[in-house]
Amino acid sequence: TGARVWVNVEGDAGTPYFRDSYGASSLTDISYAVQQVNFSTNFSNSNYCFVSGARAGSSGGGGRVVIGYDQPATSYFKYQMRNLGNNNEHVDAACLSFFGDM
């Protein structure tokens, strides 16, 4: 089966937003470089798989970013983008896909 949810997030804007998405109802801007993807339909448990990729934005970071995340929930996924110095960083593009039972 394909991804149950996927998002392409513009994270370098003043307020992050979905460039495009599937299976996500909204994006919540928590704080600097911390967002929450809210799912249209809940996963059956919080053991779903996610994959991500990102491109560094205007805030720098040497073009290298990693994702940090909180404990996954069935109805949302909260994440933050970090540079190699382990500091939160805005990114030009954050792409996340989620796989699991709904």
Predicted features along the sequence, with ranges:
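Extracellular receptor-binding modules and their adjoining Ser/Thr/Gly/Asp/Asn-rich linkers
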Residues: T1-N45, Y76-M102
